[in-house]
């Protein structure tokens, strides 16, 4: 399947969604966005390492403008506690 999915929020929920999208071959391109860029980049590295035996996909830690052209945008960010 050739689809682009953006996940906004790289916390527990957002990172799990991104991992599931990658591991189940649901999307061919995933953009993970978080206010904490380092957090998003770390989660992307973990997902890439955890899905190394799957078909290659594009997964990046990005900015809001990288969401352009997404087929689906998932907002998993919430209010800071």
What are these regions (language model features)?
Residues 21:
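Aromatic pocket-lining residues of Rossmann-like dinucleotide-binding sites
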Residues 71-76:
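N-terminal Rossmann-like NAD(P) cofactor-binding module of classical short-chain dehydrogenase/reductase
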Residues 33-69:
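Conserved N-terminal Rossmann-fold NAD(P) cofactor-binding segment
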Residues 2-5:
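Extreme N-terminal starter segment of soluble prokaryotic enzymes
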Residues 14-15:
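N-terminal Rossmann-fold NAD(P) dinucleotide-binding loop
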Residues 10-11:
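Glycine-rich Rossmann-fold phosphate-binding loop(s) that bind the pyrophosphate
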